[in-house]
Swiss-Prot record:
A lipid is attached at C50 (S-palmitoyl cysteine). The chain crosses the membrane at residues 23-43. The gene is M. It comes from Influenza A virus (strain A/Gull/Maryland/1824/1978 H13N6). Cytoplasmic tail plays an important role in virion assembly and morphogenesis. Keywords: Disulfide bond, Glycoprotein, Host cell membrane, Host membrane, Host-virus interaction, Hydrogen ion transport, Inhibition of host autophagy by virus, Ion channel, Ion transport, Lipoprotein, Membrane, Palmitate, Phosphoprotein, Signal-anchor, Transmembrane, Transmembrane helix, Transport, Viral ion channel, Virion. The record marks H37 as: Essential for channel activity, possibly by being protonated during channel activation, and by forming the channel gate and the selective filter. This is Matrix protein 2. The keyword Hydrolase does not apply. Forms a proton-selective ion channel that is necessary for the efficient release of the viral genome during virus entry. After attaching to the cell surface, the virion enters the cell by endocytosis. Acidification of the endosome triggers M2 ion channel activity. It holds the Pfam family Flu_M2. GO terms for molecular function: monoatomic ion channel activity; proton transmembrane transporter activity. GO terms for cellular component: host cell plasma membrane; membrane; virion membrane.
Length: 97
C-alpha cells in the first residue's frame, strides 16, 4: 500500500487529509518552530545589509586615538567611514598599519 493512499484520499470535493492527531503537542511545536523559522528567514532577507554591516563594522572598536594629533584622527575616521559606505553589498576592510 502506498503512503498516498494512507494519508490522502481523492473525494468528490477534492483532496482531504485524514490527520486526526493534529492536536499532538509535537505537531504543534513543529508548526510553531516552522512559522518562527519562516519569519526569521524573511527578516534576514529583508534586512541582511543592515544586520551584517552592523555586525562586521559596528561592533569593532578602532585603536585608541590617545596621543594622536587631531588631523590624523579625522583622516582615520574618514577612511574608516569610506570603507563602510561602499554600496552594492560589497564590503571593503581597510587595515591601517
Amino acid at each position: 500500500m502506498s503512503l498516498l493512499t494512507e494519508v490522502e484520499t481523492h473525494t468528490r470535493s477534492g483532496w482531504e487529509c485524514r490527520c486526526n492527531d493534529s492536536s499532538d503537542p509535537l505537531v504543534i511545536a513543529a508548526s510553531i518552530i516552522g512559522i518562527l523559522h519562516l519569519i526569521l528567514w524573511i527578516f534576514d532577507r529583508l534586512f541582511f545589509k543592515c544586520i551584517y554591516r552592523r555586525l562586521k563594522y559596528g561592533l569593532k572598536r578602532g585603536p585608541s586615538t590617545e596621543g594622536v594629533p587631531e588631523s590624523m584622527r579625522e583622516e582615520y575616521q574618514q577612511e574608516k567611514q569610506s570603507a563602510v559606505d561602499v554600496d552594492d553589498g560589497h564590503f571593503v576592510n581597510i587595515e591601517l598599519e
